[in-house]
């Protein structure tokens, strides 16, 4: 027996296989954007699978964090580990082996790779203008662009095409830039995270920006986050996880394909991600499943931080028993928590990274003091 979560390509796998399947889904009691349970029920009903679900509230989420930190072995600050562990525990009651869709986005260009391809096409277009014209705001005004689009166009116009990817994926390394690291942990050496990604770009065999991005995602995000958390969460529940999209033959085939097989232009300014997979599924699944916007595996952690959880974050990070406070700037951590409460930028992600690191130090009784 197998587990498949409710994305359209996995629903297609059930459709093509036998009907003795269990499907499992996890959601949050906040509902709305953070719960895909109605969609998961629709998929299960369509394919005739046995459906199971689990709902997590804020207290269960917080109470599960130490288990997640312990199961991860290392400080892996991805909050989707919590619902993944809950899902794995639910599935283990009925199955021993699970199938997961990790890798499909990284080899077939899911996520926002349509936006990346579109923006790169715009950059090529803008490069056709003389540089002096690109730097004149009046030229953009005559084109009818908004002030925001003018600023973006000017930025794009002044980035060499060969360096395009450097402005596209800074989040793949860390939510802390070098300056923020130095403020948080002053008077210490810091690993330059951007250099790691720059080296992976330089090592990419293709000179095409989309192919380069996919290569970097396959080497970093896929290996160091997605597969890590899938492996840790399922092992913690005594499950065996398999990833059919990462069969070496599938990966090699996908990496040989042209861009338009993965990201297809479907209008003047619209692109379709994972196009080849959608074509395969459209004869087998309803359009509302195939064309539903991708959400990934969202967690309401940042939403909760803006709605009362900031007090718990302060207690966790700033108490006298805290280990991070031994070396990290308490002022900077306090500032990040306040920014997270206000929903500013990616400050919520930074706070959760600090919380996971603090919990990891506590669970494994590690001190940052030498």
Residues covered by each model-derived region:
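Adenosyl-5′-phosphate
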Residues: 49, 80, 93, 97-99, ...
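Active-site proximal loops enriched in glycine and acidic residues that flank catalytic Cys/His/Asp
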Residues: 25-27, 55, 102, 237-238, ...
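Active-site adenylate/phosphate-handling loop in enzymes that bind or generate adenylated species
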Residues: 85-148, 227-250
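Cysteine-dependent PTP/DSP-like catalytic domain, specifically the C-terminal lobe
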Residues: 2-86, 90-93, 97
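Phosphate/oxyanion-binding loops and surfaces in catalytic or ligand/nucleic-acid-binding neighborhoods
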Residues: 16, 46, 105, 114-117, ...
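Extreme N-terminus nucleophile/cap motif
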Residues: 4, 8, 13, 126, ...
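Short aromatic-enriched loop/helix-cap "lid" or pocket-rim segments at secondary-structure transitions
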Residues: 35-37, 65-66, 109-114, 304
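Short, polar/flexible loop-turn hinges at active-site or ligand-entry regions and domain interfaces
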Residues: 52, 74-77, 119-127, 260-267
